[in-house]
Design a protein with these regions (language model features):
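Compositional signal for N-terminal targeting/processing segments
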Residues: 1-253
Length: 253
């Protein structure tokens, strides 16, 4: 049975489909994409229009990314991440976060002691170990991580490979846990989630079994794509207004 992740990008152009939505917004710490402009769009459209939302600051994944890059000074990693959490929280407040009563800002502590999350992680690890297709996909993404975190010429050390697999599994488990277990089933992220999207497209039956659900509910919205569409519509309207103004201008005698 194939399950296609519903693309809600067109529906959310007006916000109508978000009226009853529970929205999950993961934010990568240290990712310069999340500018004040992008965060303002998240607040004014996705959060304001939703039933309720969770902004998830991915401090645990940030920790793993430091480790993958070879950083071993634990205190320095923890200090850097704490500063990044404080900076992001402060930015969100400055942009008007507190005017929205339907949103929470959380980090990994939100679910780290929940046995359901640990169960999703364990089940994913088992799937990757036992399913040859999932194993191949994992290897492919680990190879991409090697370039992303270290460059083309960095050798793949055993510890680095282990950490990259851990990053991939925990990133995927976070998405599944928040959308399918906690019920924040509309996920808004910069762009496609890679491995988790592949699982929905190619291993839906296995995911339903893994999660103990008769149907999968996650819907994904690419924030990057949505913003591009908004800018394109705005540009088109501006050109239309300019054309009308030019045509309507009276001819001087």
């Amino acid at each position: 049975m194939e399950h296609v992740v519903k693309d809600a990008r067109d529906e959310t152009a007006t916000g109508e489909s978000l009226a009853e939505a529970r929205v999950f917004i993961p934010i990568s710490l240290g990712n310069h994409y999340y500018s004040s402009e992008v965060l303002s769009a998240l607040l004014s459209h996705f959060i304001a229009e939703s039933q309720c939302s969770v902004i998830f600051l991915c401090d645990r994944l940030r920790y793993l990314s430091y480790r993958i890059r070879g950083e071993t000074h634990e205190a320095r990693i923890v200090t850097n991440i704490r500063l990044q959490l404080e900076q992001m929280n402060r930015t969100l407040v400055n942009l008007g976060l507190n005017s929205h009563s339907n949103v929470r800002v959380v980090d990994w502590s939100f679910m780290q002691d929940d046995p359901r999350y640990a169960g999703v992680v364990a089940s994913l690890e088992r799937l990757v170990e036992e399913d040859s297709w999932a194993q191949q996909q994992t290897d492919r993404y680990v190879a991409q991580f090697a370039v992303r975190f270290g460059g083309f010429d960095v050798p793949l050390h055993e510890d680095s490979i282990r950490l990259q697999r851990q990053y991939l599994v925990e990133e995927t488990a976070l998405s599944l846990y928040m959308t399918e277990v906690r019920g924040f089933n509309v996920e808004v992220y910069r762009k496609g989630m890679g491995f988790v999207d592949d699982l929905y497209s190619n291993r839906a039956t296995e995911l339903m079994s893994l999660l103990g659900k008769p149907a999968l509910e996650r819907r994904f919205i690419s924030l990057e794509h949505w913003l591009d569409r908004v800018k394109a519509r705005t540009s088109s309207k501006s050109r239309s207004c300019l054309t009308v103004a030019t045509v309507s201008r009276p001819v001087q005698a």
